[in-house]
């Protein structure tokens, strides 16, 4: 039989390149092809025998393996060396695949296939149900108004990704330590030993079961509040991370756990405690004329909307539903916790109303009738099992500052929001009662003993100055023809001196090292600042204004730099007022140092702006005492006593190796002026008219009506 000759080997054809085949476009089969050259990508040519077609392709499909990725075997008659040729062809394919992978790694362009895959994934995610998205999305968007934390979103599933901060034992313990150091002394709504046993020692919290939703929400709120009280340096030292990252992580965990615990439906006060801690930092700006200027605990700089102001109404309603004002039926421990929580809500309600400004949700009558302060004791004096009554302590305790704050909100409501309190006699009587209750708490207080004692010592003095300022310049706008008159010019304290004393105390906290732990808690209150500016505007004593203006200017700059979520009406009013005061005082106080006025509200250019005797002192240039009034004459306490009055009846000398003096303004309503030689140079009607215009501008800012310095 005649031997058949070898069959000619099938030639490798130049087929469409990889990219053109994927894009399904016609390829000119050049090397490189025109399409790849114009696209600026690497062209991967394809050279192989053509795949069988027709009857041959059908037969191959029937005989192909189940694995779709398996190579297709081409059944072609071949000579004895066909296996070697097939191996060579396979090696070439492998080399082409390797080249293709290398080119994909080196190329910055995304192939069509990758883009289509991404589009498919994105379109698939967009079709997921909204409830599933709530579980995957860790943040509360501004459009929800913060209602998600109330449990109104319809999803109660926890976000394990963001709640993991509670599972990180080391981070949660450090944040708890920060809370006990920076927050607990000034926001006293929790029992310190119980928190320590729970978060630092791993014991159960007040008998709650493990992983109870209320306890988890409280733990997350503690971490969140502690994170906001950190400085950037402290954040790096403790966590090796920026403060913003720690705050963002803690906030998401707090919102997640609050949503799970549902404050609207929870029957325990622990959830409300967590909710209040979340809200404390949230209200837009602390604007307290009795300058609390405190409790910036959670979202002030992050959420400048009115969401938290609205959520405050939920907290008040929840507190009433839990019967917090009465607190009956509990043991001694439960009664103390309820009283602390209710008065903290009243305080936040008062501060929030001043920051808008608006009427408080809790009326004066309701706040007065339900005012039952907790005991003046330390947390170590009682525990959850205490059933007997614990008497008050003398001297500084864990609750001293909070008790003063509760008295501040009670007096502030009477002086600012009670229409019936109009005559000078009743207003002075309210201030005197407030002073008697608060200054009594300073007895035996050594301001040099601890930073907390130092902070409490100076803040209480600041509160008393603020109460007197509220008696003279209430926040309530007077529409009648008979406004409240100021105190007698021969016996009354100086309005400007009171305002400057408050601003100086704020600077003291921000400059003295002993106030570092509480600086997050204290900002410049806008009411004393506005009063000081308006008094400088109408004051005729140029020498007095020259001494007072650097303090006012420094306070205004600090207010603008630190308060980013202030009310629009308040910000506009302060800007306009400052611009007008600068414009008026510029000719009389013009020196080499120029202060630039606001370009938005000032009608004149920078050439007409105010110049002051010297640049307002920076924080680094102020001495450790932080006393911006240190170069002025101060009157001693004995000089301010009335005839026959004993100094011991007014205050006790603190137990200290370096005795401290209470500010002279705090001894009596007819005390001498803060600035030596100062006289009352402003007529009562003109002084009141200046403040009345400031208050009216807050309510009538959109009307554009003319006034003495805001037009």
Curated annotation (Swiss-Prot):
Annotated spans, Disordered: 372-394
Signal peptide region: none
Pfam families, alphabetized: Zn_clus
DNA-binding residue intervals: 17-43
Keyword Repressor: no
Entry-linked PROSITE patterns: ZN2_CY6_FUNGAL_1, ZN2_CY6_FUNGAL_2
Subcellular location: Nucleus
UniProt GO molecular function: DNA binding; DNA-binding transcription factor activity, RNA polymerase II-specific; zinc ion binding
UniProt key word Isomerase: no
Principal location listed in the UniProt entry: nucleus
Stored InterPro entries: Sec_Metabolite_Reg, Zn2-C6_fun-type_DNA-bd_sf, Zn2Cys6_DnaBD
GO CC terms: nucleus
Keywords linked to the UniProt accession: DNA-binding, Metal-binding, Nucleus, Transcription, Transcription regulation
Protein name: C6 finger domain transcription factor nscR
Organism: Trichophyton equinum (strain ATCC MYA-4606 / CBS 127.97)
